[in-house]
Amino acid sequence: MSRKPFIAGNWKMNKNPEEAKAFVEAVASKLPSADLVEAGIAVPAVDLTTVIAAAKGSNLKVAAQNTYFENSGAFTGETSPQVLKEIGTDYVVIGHSERRDYFHETDEDINKKAKAIFANGMIPIICCGESLETYEAGKAAEFVGAQVSAALAGLTPEQVASSVIAYEPIWAIGTGKSASQDDAQKMCKVVRDVVAADFGQEVADKVRVLYGGSVKPENVAEYMACPDVDGALVGGASLEPESFLALLDFVK
């Protein structure tokens, strides 16, 4: 089963619209062929319309970093998935460990968001990952498996097959520590095996599983060599055009 590699940058809460536009203009014409690899960037809500306009006609996909699960209503400060679709958003990141930790998002919240994203014709990038404590206790597979099952509950097999699931060990995010190649492969296979158990092997063979956690141009190729790693969700190394483009060099 051939799955197209996907390198997705996550700017987190960085860049104003002017800086965001300059970034897209610097990378848009230099991206590899969309037949070889999918390139995307998850940007702050205030940058979305600017980035979508600047990326038009290029191979760059645009992701929101979060959404609410209702399309409209009295939800002050939230972002409508319906409006995200209307402005041209391709993907939505949900369940990032920073959202789970700082904003107390639950597996149930993330599942509702996944359903809302699909209902509005976009694709979720569903994040999962364990703490250092869970990892050292030898419970990473059990913990991450439960997160994945909960996030996908009630979705159709077709929806799950088109989903992107990003495994990010919390202890490796922004710390400079990264999981070994063996750890990344083992845990991305855990994710795929959970999908197979819940939705069947055919669906599991289609879902794209990304690794995230201190991925850099220097180590991306070793992760991409793993059979169950289909791409990367990248934080700090996606902030500069040169570094972002270098992440895509593994396809050469």
Curated annotation (Swiss-Prot):
Catalytic activity: D-glyceraldehyde 3-phosphate = dihydroxyacetone phosphate
Pathway entry: Carbohydrate biosynthesis; gluconeogenesis; Carbohydrate degradation; glycolysis; D-glyceraldehyde 3-phosphate from glycerone phosphate: step 1/1
GO cellular component: cytosol
Keywords: Cytoplasm, Gluconeogenesis, Glycolysis, Isomerase
Record localization: Cytoplasm
Active-site feature positions: H96, E168
Top-level division of the source organism's lineage: Bacteria
One GO MF term attached to the UniProt entry: triose-phosphate isomerase activity
Pfam families registered for this protein in UniProt: TIM
Binding site for substrate: N10, W11, K12, G174, S214, G235, G236
EC number: 5.3.1.1
UniProt-listed GO biological process terms: gluconeogenesis; glyceraldehyde-3-phosphate biosynthetic process; glycerol catabolic process; glycolytic process
Coiled-coil annotated residue ranges, if any: none
Enzyme class: isomerase
Function: Involved in the gluconeogenesis. Catalyzes stereospecifically the conversion of dihydroxyacetone phosphate (DHAP) to D-glyceraldehyde-3-phosphate (G3P).
SUBUNIT field: Homodimer.
Family: Belongs to the triosephosphate isomerase family.
HAMAP family: TIM_B
Name of the featured protein: Triosephosphate isomerase
Species for this entry: Streptococcus thermophilus (strain ATCC BAA-250 / LMG 18311)
Gene name per UniProt: tpiA
